[in-house]
Every structure is written in C-alpha cells, then in structure tokens.
C-alpha cells in the first residue's frame, strides 16, 4: 500500500481500488443499498456530510478544499442556508453521475493514510514519545495534505514534540 500522490486523486473513480484504499464499501447506483445518495441535490443532506465544528477546526490547506464543500455555487456557505457542508469527494464523479445525485465512488472504511496515523499513535504510546518511525509516518500524511509544501497552518511533526503534543497532532490529522 501507499498514499495516492495528489490529494485531489484520493477519491477519484480511477483510484477507488488504488494503492491507498485498503477496505471500502463498493458503491453502485444500480443497487439502492450501496448508492451513497450524494448531497449535490440535497445541499449537504446526503449520507455523508461534515460536522460544522470539524470544518471550522480543519487547517487551511489543500486537503480541506479537496475534501469539503463549504459553499454552494453562488458562494453562500451551507450553514448560512441552514444545511451542513458536503463531503466533496463526490465532485470527482462523472458530471452525469454528480448531476443525478448518484456515485460509483466507493465509501472508504480504512485507507493507508489511516494505518500510518494508527501506527504513529501506537508508536508514540509504546515509546513514551515520538520516534523517527512515528514522525515519518504522520509526516507522509501531512506532506500530502499540504501538496508537499511547507504550511504554517499544518506544520510537520518532529521528534522534539512531547508525547501529549504528538498525540494531539496525530488526532488532528
């Protein structure tokens, strides 16, 4: 397994069985039980929407704008309209599927990024603080989230972090 290089490709139809997806629910709009009922026609009321507090606390980085639909086409926030922000991954469907409110993009359960973060957290707890292996694991996720450029809003983890600070960083990711 490996991370998909470009954050915008994590949820594309081309990578739904890609190197990052370890376990997912298959989505098929011909079977209503597996169609995720995307939020496009429902302004955030599909099967997957984002909690407003989570959206507000999300670091300002490329990943935020690749994953979350915060405004509608006219620029109003979904909260202003009385709705929840949408999970933007469905905008990577074909225009026909998106316009019809359906999707063939699988719903991820565990991605390789999740495993890297679980390892970093477990390693931190087992060692009483971050190790180089744990720092390297979380930094793979952070680097990809920031499109591989330094971002003061989401800095890399380091060995100098305390066990508590490193744990908070992993949980934030």
Where do the PLM segments sit?
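His/Glu-based metal-binding/catalytic segments typifying zinc-dependent metallopeptidases
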Residues: 18-19, 26-54
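Acidic/polar-rich alpha-helix caps and helix-coil junctions
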Residues: 1-30, 62-173
């Amino acid at each position: 397994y490996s991370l998909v290089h470009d954050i915008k490709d994590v949820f594309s139809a081309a990578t739904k069985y890609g190197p990052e997806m370890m376990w997912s629910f298959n989505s098929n709009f011909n079977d209503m039980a597996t169609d995720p009922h995307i939020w496009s026609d429902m302004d955030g009321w599909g099967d997957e929407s984002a909690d407003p507090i989570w959206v507000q606390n999300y670091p300002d980085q490329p990943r935020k704008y690749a994953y979350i639909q915060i405004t509608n086409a006219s620029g109003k926030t979904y909260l202003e309209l009385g709705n929840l922000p949408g999970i933007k991954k469905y905008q990577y469907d074909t225009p026909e599927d998106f316009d019809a409110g359906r999707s063939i993009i699988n719903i991820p359960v565990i991605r390789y990024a999740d495993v890297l973060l679980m390892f970093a957290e477990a390693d931190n707890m087992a060692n009483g603080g971050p190790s180089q292996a744990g720092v390297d694991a979380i930094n793979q996720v952070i680097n990809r989230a920031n499109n591989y450029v330094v971002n003061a809003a989401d800095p890399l983890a380091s060995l100098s972090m305390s066990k508590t600070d490193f744990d908070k960083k992993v949980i934030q990711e």
